[in-house]
Design a protein with these regions (language model features):
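Active-site loop ensemble at the mouth of alpha/beta enzyme cores that anchors a bound cofactor
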Residues: 423-445
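Hard-cation-handling environments
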Residues: 355-430
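Acidic, metal/ion-coordinating pockets
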Residues: 2-13, 18, 23-352, 359-360, ...
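Flexible glycine/proline-enriched surface loops and loop-helix/loop-strand junctions
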Residues: 314, 383-388, 440-443
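Conserved small/polar residues in nucleotide/adenosyl-binding loops
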Residues: 459-461
Length: 461
């Protein structure tokens, strides 16, 4: 791996951003320079920044992109359902470059050893502060796409309080959720009260009164432009997770409700309408073709990292990856109350290149201090690459299932095909932190039951 000093010589990040083609070209020669990192086609009066699916990760991580990402029907063979060489070709990314490493599994291990980990919220903070400085603080809106509070040892021990504290320090201005609901309704409400910004979601209704549980929309003025942010929580939460955790609440996509909320926002003077969504990429692609009046969809849930926004009719759709690996950015120009131009990019947060923000580092260290000894406790070493991410299982799932078979004396073991969970390279130590990045949840029970072959054949994960 390049040394920190070499990386800093290659790139200082006083501000940042890289337009895909220009950065890709210089990266092929391994000559990243400051001007390349600063290169972004800034436009208009407004900048949207998007973080999503961080799954409790405060520190830099390895996170291997998928080996499979199957699309169904008309979604087959198009983003985000492209992997490896097909992904590189579609987005005009040269192999063996930083972008190729950030976005595909091609030659993942040697490239990971060269370019290092990505993410770490203190490194992301450096980028956010640089963009705010570049654009002007009054033009930037930072939004959180959910699945933020769950997924690590510290998030489990603090029941989400660690991530709430950090996201407040980042000056986040709105969020939506999914795994946030698995803390239970009482804890969810406690954490929402501590946020200091709205937990938006117009698609969750009280089953007794058939009324919205959360506010649907928040208005912001940035760069003299009125922006409406409409929230969409994960619509299948009671199916994907235990329904008792959201008792009395009904979830769904609710297209009619969403269209009404968009129309209402327009009538109230919104010049930009943003859907902050945890629907998943394919659902939001379909939604964008059915709902009128949405300018931008910032999508999450499926962990797809798309290098730039994809336009569907009049809507720009951006998916900003997961685990803190990326920061999404969209600039918008508004004229006569309408969006007339946009520029978008997904910024890989290379932690060996981007210096950490000292204040955020101090906060993260303070949060982790009571748990540091246990987090760092080594329980083994991996001989092979351990990862999760695809539609089905990864090698971490194999380890978990093999362990359950051995410890619970079973013939078959089943594990949900989660997409969250960080990666370990061959030869790395396995720590408690690593184990909890795969297993941290508020309903961790393992059940041993008898099943017939017919029952097994009916299971869909």
């Amino acid at each position: 791996m390049r040394s920190r000093r070499e990386f800093i010589q290659l790139a200082s990040v006083s501000a940042m951003l890289l337009a895909t083609k220009s950065w890709n070209a210089v990266a092929a020669k391994q000559k990243l320079k400051t001007e390349d990192l600063l290169d972004f086609d800034s436009k208009g009066q407004v900048t949207l920044l998007h973080l999503t699916d961080m799954h409790g990760q405060l520190k830099p991580v390895y996170f291997r992109p998928p080996s499979e990402n199957f699309g169904v029907g008309k979604f087959e063979g198009i983003p985000p359902h492209l992997i490896g060489e097909a992904f590189l070709k579609h987005f005009d990314i040269l192999p063996n470059t930083p972008l190729a490493y950030a976005h595909t599994m091609v030659d993942y291990v040697p490239l990971a050893m060269e370019y290092g980990k990505l993410g770490g919220l203190d490194h992301t903070t450096t980028l956010i502060k640089a963009i705010r400085s570049e654009r002007g603080d009054d033009k930037v809106l930072l939004l959180d796409g959910g699945d933020t509070w769950q997924g690590s040892y510290t998030s489990l021990q603090t029941q989400g309080a660690d991530m709430v504290e950090v996201m407040r320090a980042l000056r986040t201005e709105a969020m939506v959720g999914h795994w946030e609901f698995t803390f239970g309704q009482d804890r969810l409400k406690e954490l929402i009260d501590k946020l200091g910004y709205p937990f938006l979601g117009g698609n969750v209704f009280d089953t007794e009164w058939d009324e919205p549980v959360f506010e649907s929309t928040a208005f912001f003025e940035k760069g003299g432009v009125s922006i409406a942010v409409i929230g969409q929580h994960f619509p299948y939460t009671p199916i994907a997770n235990p329904s008792y955790m959201v008792k009395g609440w009904s979830f769904g996509i609710r297209l009619e409700v969403l269209q009404k909320n968009v129309n209402k926002a327009k009538k109230q003077g919104a010049e930009i309408v943003v859907l902050l969504s945890h629907n998943g990429f394919d659902v939001d692609q379909k939604l964008a073709s059915m709902i009128d009046g949405i300018d931008v969809i910032l999508t999450g849930h499926t962990h797809d990292a798309i290098p730039k926004g994809i336009r569907i009719k009049d809507t720009l759709l951006l998916s900003s990856g997961s685990h803190g690996k990326y920061l999404g950015r969209i600039d918008l120009k508004v004229k006569n109350g309408k969006v007339v131009d946009t520029s978008s990019n997904l910024i890989p947060v290379f932690s060996d290149i981007i210096p950490p923000d000292p204040d955020m580092t101090k906060l993260i260290n303070k949060i982790r201090a009571p748990y540091q000894s246990e987090c760092n406790r080594v329980i083994g070493e991996t001989e092979t690459l351990l990862y999760r991410r695809g539609n089905f299982n990864g090698s971490w799932d194999d380890v978990i299932c093999d362990t359950i078979i051995r410890e619970r004396d079973t013939e078959i073991s089943l594990s949900p095909g989660f997409r969250w969970g960080t990666t370990l390279l061959p030869g790395q130590k396995i720590t408690i932190d690593d184990i909890y990045s795969q297993t941290s949840m508020n309903y961790p029970e393992v059940y041993r039951i008898e099943m017939t072959g017919k029952m097994l054949s009916l299971i869909h994960i």
